[in-house]
């Protein structure tokens, strides 16, 4: 590599024989996390756990300004007996210049805004109570806002890099989540 452009090198977890991307499980044109949730209800061997995890991923995507939340970045791992589990998260790319819009909408028929309010309104569809959802969003925001700078420093980020990426982690939606504890 000869460029000064930032890159990420990750070790991928998947075994191609046991992982299928969410977009391959149906011929329907998805566009919403609630569509993925419907599939989880049909195929998961632990649907409530997977629904909770999917909702947390929505909030995480919002809080880190993930620019790569399209359907091809959601998958399932074969769990045996014709059952599946939501795969570990992958292809998460914080983007400081990210428009506050998601690639995958939260609720069918809703906007594609990267909105904590919409995620909280949808929590019951993902089998979370509003109280639990608010608490989880707060804890996630607190962890992200408190730790992102050190995490980047630990990976060799410069002060300029930190300034560049600040808007990906510290923005209106992360502040809303932090206010949930008040």
Residue ranges and their predicted role:
Residues 1-71, 75-182:
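Anionic ligand-binding catalytic core segments
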